[in-house]
Amino acid sequence: QEPQPEQDPFELSGKWITSYIGSSDLEKIGENAPFQVFMRSIEFDDKESKVYLNFFSKENGICEEFSLIGTKQEGNTYDVNYAGNNKFVVSYASETALIISNINVDEEGDKTIMTGLLGKGTDIEDQDLEKFKEVTRENGIPEENIVNIIERDDCPA
C-alpha cells in the first residue's frame, strides 16, 4: 500500500454525509446515543486553526442539530468538545470519501475509539468501504462493531 499524500484540509471542506461508524463501545453509536451522528458538513480553516462541524443527532426519534467548533492541534489532530473531549484526525481522504478516527473521553473518564466513513452522498465506493474497514481494524475495533448510519438517517438535509 502506497502512503497517502498529505491532504490539504482546506480542500476537504464541504458537504459530508455519515455512511458508517465503528466504535469500541457499541452503546456510544446505538439508538439515542451521542455518536450516532448524521454529519452534514465539515469546514477546515487552517488560517484560524479551526474546524467547523455541522451534524444532527437523534434522541427519541427527534433530530437535534449541532454546530461545533474544534481547534487544530499538532499533526493535523483536532480537539472538539461534544459528549466529553474528542481528538480526531482525517485518516484517509479521496474525492468521494473521508475516513475519520476519533478518541472520545466522556464525562466519566471512559475512553472510546471510533471511526467514521463520510461520503459526498449516500453512495459509497467499494474501495472506500474496504479502506474504512481496514482503518477500523487498525484502531482495534472489530468489524461487527460497524453500524450502517445511512439507513438510520432521516434528519433534514
UniProtKB/Swiss-Prot annotation:
UniProt cross-references to SUPFAM superfamilies, sorted A to Z: Lipocalins (SSF50814)
Family annotation (InterPro entries): Calycin, Lipocalin, Lipocln_cytosolic_FA-bd_dom, OBP-like
Principal localisation: secreted
CDD domains: lipocalin_OBP-like
Location in the cell: Secreted
Location of Pyrrolidone carboxylic acid modifications: 1
Biological processes per GO annotation: sensory perception of smell
Alphabetic keyword roster: Disulfide bond, Olfaction, Pyrrolidone carboxylic acid, Secreted, Sensory transduction, Transport
Keyword Transmembrane recorded: no
Disulfide bonds: 63-155
Matching Pfam families: Lipocalin
GO molecular function terms noted in the UniProt entry: odorant binding; small molecule binding
Gene Ontology cellular component terms for the protein in this record: extracellular space
Similarity comment text for this entry: Belongs to the calycin superfamily. Lipocalin family.
Reported function: This protein is found in nasal epithelium and it binds a wide variety of chemical odorants.
Subunit structure: Monomer.
Protein name: Odorant-binding protein
Source species of the chain: Sus scrofa
Species classification: Eukaryota, Metazoa, Chordata, Craniata, Vertebrata
